[in-house]
């Protein structure tokens, strides 16, 4: 098992038990699982997760894509119209370039 995976699982276990995530607790869990991890990695994970609620992160993460999909479906028609207008403007600009006499084989 990789260091990152072991520490991630240990952090999730601590968060599920509603225990503060510290480097000492991360190392204790990882060593009980017979995974060798350097102390600096546990310190980095503990500092990165300090003050963050992992449960809230996962609950908000699962709800966000559903809300974005619902909002995108409602406004899809307007976006298609804007794209069509932009294409028409680009075609008009390309045609006007031909009239300037800058052709390659003129």
Swiss-Prot record:
Subunit structure: Component of the large ribosomal subunit (LSU). Mature ribosomes consist of a small (40S) and a large (60S) subunit. The 40S subunit contains about 32 different proteins and 1 molecule of RNA (18S). The 60S subunit contains 45 different proteins and 3 molecules of RNA (25S, 5.8S and 5S). The 5 acidic ribosomal P-proteins form the stalk structure of the 60S subunit. They are organized as a pentameric complex in which uL10/P0 interacts with 2 heterodimers, P1A-P2B and P1B-P2A.
Database matches in HAMAP family: Ribosomal_L12_arch
Function noted in UniProt: Component of the ribosome, a large ribonucleoprotein complex responsible for the synthesis of proteins in the cell. The small ribosomal subunit (SSU) binds messenger RNAs (mRNAs) and translates the encoded message by selecting cognate aminoacyl-transfer RNA (tRNA) molecules. The large subunit (LSU) contains the ribosomal catalytic site termed the peptidyl transferase center (PTC), which catalyzes the formation of peptide bonds, thereby polymerizing the amino acids delivered by tRNAs into a polypeptide chain.
Gene Ontology CC annotations of this record: cytosolic large ribosomal subunit; ribosome
Entry-linked InterPro entries: P1/P2_N_sf (IPR038716), Ribosomal_P1/P2 (IPR027534)
Assigned keywords, A-Z: Cytoplasm, Ribonucleoprotein, Ribosomal protein
Main location: cytoplasm
Region (Disordered), start-end ranges: 74-106
Acidic residues composition bias: residue spans: 82-100
GO molecular function, a single term: structural constituent of ribosome
Keyword Ribosomal protein: yes
Intracellular or extracellular location(s): Cytoplasm
Tree of life domain: Eukaryota
PANTHER family: 60S ACIDIC RIBOSOMAL PROTEIN P1 (PTHR45696), LARGE RIBOSOMAL SUBUNIT PROTEIN P1 (PTHR45696:SF10)
A Pfam family: Ribosomal_60s
PTM entry text: Phosphorylated.
One of the GO biological process terms: cytoplasmic translation
Official protein name in the record: Large ribosomal subunit protein P1A
The gene coding this protein: RPP1A
Similarity comment: Belongs to the eukaryotic ribosomal protein P1/P2 family.
Organism: Candida albicans (strain SC5314 / ATCC MYA-2876) (Yeast)
């Amino acid at each position: 098992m990789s260091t990152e995976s072991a520490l991630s699982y240990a952090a999730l276990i601590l968060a599920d038990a509603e225990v503060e995530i510290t480097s000492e607790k991360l190392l204790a869990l990882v060593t009980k699982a017979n995974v060798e991890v350097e102390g600096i990695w546990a310190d980095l994970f503990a500092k990165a997760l300090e003050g963050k609620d992992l449960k809230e992160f996962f609950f908000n993460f699962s709800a966000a894509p559903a809300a974005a999909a619902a909002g995108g479906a409602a406004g899809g028609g307007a976006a298609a119209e804007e794209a069509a207008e932009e294409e028409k403007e680009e075609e008009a600009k390309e045609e006007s370039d031909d009239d300037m006499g800058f052709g390659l084989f003129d």
